[in-house]
Amino acid sequence: MNRIAFVFTHGPHGDAAGREGLDALLATSALAEDIGVFFIADGVLLLLEQQQPAQILARDFVATFGVLSLYDVDSLYLCAESAAERGLDADAGWVLNAEWLSAADWRQRLSAYDTVMTF
């Protein structure tokens, strides 16, 4: 079975990449067993709690990341450098528990996947 990675690089608002990636991830989880989810650059912002998308007339899809464990998606990785560059740390309040990795470890973990889909 192929190992499939989903890489989130865009923030939660401004374009539909995060929402579309999450939809694709949930659909793929019904067909694949070995899925990894990676957050880097502005993609780390997808995991922040307390977002208020209604104020910009956007849909609140970020909380849906919290149900990934119900879909047996447990391999979650966040680039620690990306979070630090945005002034975030482990205490920032996250919608799910992702493993914090250095950029080098993040890339190494990603390289173990056969297919990479970037959103």
Swiss-Prot record:
**Which BP terms from GO are recorded?**
tRNA processing
Q: State the NCBIfam families in the record.
A: PRK00211.1 (NF001238), sulf_tusC_dsrF (TIGR03010)
Q: Which Gene3D superfamilies match?
A: DsrEFH-like (3.40.1260.10)
Give the function comment from the record. Answer: Part of a sulfur-relay system required for 2-thiolation of 5-methylaminomethyl-2-thiouridine (mnm(5)s(2)U) at tRNA wobble positions.
Which HAMAP family does the UniProt entry name for this protein? Thiourid_synth_C (MF_00389)
This protein's assembly is summarised as:
Heterohexamer, formed by a dimer of trimers. The hexameric TusBCD complex contains 2 copies each of TusB, TusC and TusD. The TusBCD complex interacts with TusE.
InterPro entries noted in UniProt: DsrEFH-like (IPR027396), Sulphur_relay_DsrE/F-like (IPR003787), Sulphur_relay_TusC (IPR037450), Sulphur_relay_TusC/DsrF (IPR017462)
User: Which family is it part of?
Assistant: Belongs to the DsrF/TusC family.
Q: Where in the cell is it found?
A: Cytoplasm
- Tell me, in one coarse class, where this protein mainly resides: cytoplasm
Q: Indicate whether tRNA processing appears among the record's keywords.
A: yes
Q: Which UniProt keywords apply?
A: Cytoplasm, tRNA processing
Cellular component GO terms, alphabetical: cytoplasm
Tell me the protein's name.
Protein TusC
Which top-rank group of organisms is this from? Bacteria
